């Protein structure tokens, strides 16, 4: 396990979400240029789930938080690597493709693989760090 993957796991612990904590790091030229974890938008109360433990529809995924944070910085993600603790969904995969990220390393599979398949179709190198099949 590389240090960036381990750091993404530690970053996930910042999430206020109870059901699932996900962390993401964008690395370029061996430097972390952005980070994110799943949670509510800025200015919202840090409650990810409703009274029935269902995730609120406005909760942002870790990848989306990391990528949108880049949009407000002087960095760009062209040719970078995204380390994320869980497999990106289809919506985050579209953001990853459009942001110029060229490599995604993830540690936990999701029941749907449409996001992974879309990134591969777009020519992004996708690496799963879990058990070999």
Where are these regions (language model features)?
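Zinc-dependent deaminase catalytic domain
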Residues: 1-133
